[in-house]
C-alpha cells in the first residue's frame, strides 16, 4: 500500500510540474518505460513486474477525470494519455511476467480465479493501449475512438476484481480505491445528468 501511495504522489507531482515536457518528450518516456520494463521482466520481484507501478499510473488516470476544475486537473488531463500509455507498458510487463511464471511452474490451467481475471484485464487493455498512441488515434474517427475507450471502465472493473479477489493484506485498500471510484463516478454521472435536464427543458419550450 505504501509503495502504491508514494508512487501515486510522485506521479501527480511530476506530472503537475513537468506536464509540458511530458507531452514534448513522450516518445522518449515510452522508450524509457519499455527499457525499464524489459529489465524488470528479467528480475525476480520489482515494483514494475509486481504490478504496483502500473496500478499507480492507472489510479491517477482514473481519478483525474473526477476532480473539480482546477489547475491540477488541467495539467494532469493534458498528460492523461501519456500516463495511460506508460501505465499500460508497466501493466503489460506485470501480466506477461506472471503468465510466464505460471507456465514455467505448470499451474496456468489450475490458477486461482483472480489470475484469469488479470489476464482478461490485459486483453481488454491492449486495444486501449494501442489506440492511445497519437499516431494511431489520428487514424481513427473520433466517435469510434470514444466508443472503443468506453472499454476502460470494463478494464477498471476487471483490475478491481483481480486485486480484491487476491485477498491479501491490501484488500481494504483496494476496496476503498475501486469502490470509492465507482461511487464517485456514479455521482459525477448523476450530476452531469441533472445539469443537462434544465437545458433540455429550455430547448423543448423554445420549440
Predicted regions and their residues:
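Membrane-embedded alpha-helical bundles that constitute the cytochrome b-like, heme-associated redox core
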Residues: 1-207
Amino acid at each position: 500500500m505504501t509503495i502504491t501511495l508514494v508512487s501515486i504522489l510522485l506521479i501527480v507531482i511530476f506530472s503537475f510540474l513537468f506536464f509540458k515536457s511530458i507531452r514534448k518528450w513522450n516518445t522518449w518516456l515510452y522508450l524509457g518505460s519499455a527499457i525499464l520494463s524489459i529489465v524488470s521482466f528479467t528480475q525476480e520481484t520489482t515494483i514494475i513486474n509486481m504490478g504496483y507501478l502500473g496500478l499507480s499510473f492507472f489510479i491517477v488516470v482514473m481519478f483525474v477525470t473526477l476532480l473539480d476544475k482546477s489547475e491540477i486537473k488541467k495539467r494532469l488531463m493534458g498528460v492523461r494519455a501519456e500516463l495511460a500509455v506508460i501505465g499500460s507498458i508497466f501493466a503489460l510487463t506485470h501480466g506477461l511476467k506472471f503468465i510466464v511464471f505460471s507456465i514455467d511452474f505448470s499451474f496456468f490451467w489450475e490458477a486461482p480465479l483472480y489470475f484469469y481475471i488479470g489476464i482478461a484485464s490485459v486483453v481488454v487493455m491492449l486495444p486501449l493501449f494501442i489506440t492511445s498512441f497519437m499516431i494511431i488515434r489520428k487514424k481513427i474517427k473520433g466517435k469510434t475512438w470514444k466508443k472503443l475507450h468506453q472499454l476502460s471502465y470494463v478494464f477498471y472493473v476487471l483490475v478491481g476484481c483481480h486485486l480484491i479477489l487476491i485477498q491479501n493484506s491490501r484488500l481494504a485498500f483496494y476496496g476503498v480505491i475501486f469502490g470509492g471510484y465507482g461511487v464517485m463516478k456514479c455521482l459525477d454521472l448523476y450530476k452531469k445528468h441533472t445539469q443537462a435536464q434544465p437545458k433540455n427543458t429550455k430547448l423543448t419550450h423554445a420549440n
